[in-house]
Each structure stands twice: as structure tokens, then as C-alpha cells.
Amino acid sequence: MAAPSEAPVTRQVSGHAAPAPVPSGPASWQPLAAAVAELPVLDASGRPVLFGELFRERRAIVVFVRHFLCYICKEYVEDLAKIPKSFLQEANVTLIVIGQSSYHHIEPFCKLTGYSHEIYVDPEREIYKRLGMKRGEEIASSGQSPHVKSNILSGSIRSLWRAVTGPLFDFQGDPAQQGGTLILGPGNNIHFIHHDRNRLDHKPINSVLQLVGVQHVDFTSRPSVIHV
């Protein structure tokens, strides 16, 4: 079960970076890391900080989600919330989620998912663009995700319900935007990039943890897939 929810560390990305293609190899990723590191982020109260500060001192797993109303993203982040902080501390690794909604949605999303690791937002999708995150879904088989509990009908209904009953009626981000996963730091180094091709193409969490030497987590103690 996830640890009790704590006040999340939250900042919002702003700025006006132009889209850029992502280089193809680790050596050429360093200028890309340096470029995104200079983009400013804001926390939930609007305080600015450079994105690069998040991975300057240690390695960071950075998960870019589609949007906070996406039921698949919600269930994926629910499993991220189950990663014990002690596991990350032992490996000297930080876990960060980036969304693309207004920062006003961050605290409700954390309460909903039980997520208490670091979380920020990029409402204008500037970092998404710089990193080459896809917009629109590629038709490709991504297999069965170990982190998705709902089917498309039940999940979509719950997402719509959250949209119409929330204090701000919006989609909490561009619904066509896809996410991805990176491993960065310390400093301006990118060690791994995965671009999601569609909403189900996120990396299994334990495969990412393995890359940074973090212990595997048992995500199986949860309800079966919900059918409607």
C-alpha cells in the first residue's frame, strides 16, 4: 500500500522554448540536457526554480505524464506512489513526475493518487517539446501494462466525471500530448529516454528502477482489472 500522502514538492514549468528534435545518442544528449535545464519551473505556490536544479546533484527518474485526467496516468502514478522513499534514498535517486496542467491541479492529483514524491507541471509543454515528446497517438501494440487497472470504458467515464465535478472544468492538459520517461543527472547528463508512442506505452516501473539500481517493488497487491 502507498505511504500516507505528504505535501508534494511542486513547481510549474513556464517559458517559450521552440520544439527541437531529440539527438540519437548519449554523447549528443548532453546539450539537450543543458537546454532543458535552463527552463524555469514554478512550484505549487508559484516560486521559480530552474528545471536543472532537480537533477543537478543526483540522478533522477523523470516521468512525463499525458495529463492529470488520463486514467492510465492516474493508475501509473498510483503505482509510482508505492515506491518507498527509502529505496530511492539507498540508491541516491530522485523520482519526479511532470504534468502539463495548471499547477492548481497538482495537490488534488496527489491526494487522488497518494503520490508524495516530487511533482511539477509544464502547462505550455515547453520541456515536452524540447525533449521531442509525441503529440497524437501512434497505432502500435504496447502489450498489457502491469500498472493499468481499468478498461477504457470505465476509466474514461471516471476521467470525465472528475473533469465535470472538479473545481476547474478543464482537461488538465492537452489530451493529445503523450509522455515519456528519462533518467538524468547528476548535472546535465541524460542516460535514458523513452518516448511514449501512445497512452499505454509507458515503461514498466520496475524496468526503470533496475536501470538506476533501485530495488524492485511488488505492484501485484491491488484489485484486478475493472470491467463494466
UniProtKB/Swiss-Prot annotation:
CDD domains: PRX_like2. Gene3D superfamilies: Glutaredoxin. GO terms for biological process: positive regulation of ERK1 and ERK2 cascade; positive regulation of glycolytic process. Transmembrane segments: none annotated. InterPro entries: PXL2A/B/C, Thioredoxin-like_sf. Pfam families: AhpC-TSA_2 (PF13911). Residues 13-22 have a biased composition (Low complexity). It comes from the Eukaryota. Residues 1-22 are annotated as: Disordered. PANTHER family: PEROXIREDOXIN-LIKE 2C, PTHR28630. May positively regulate ERK1/2 signaling and AKT1 activation leading to HIF1A up-regulation with an increased expression of glycolysis genes and enhanced glycolysis. Belongs to the peroxiredoxin-like PRXL2 family. PRXL2C subfamily. This is Peroxiredoxin-like 2C.
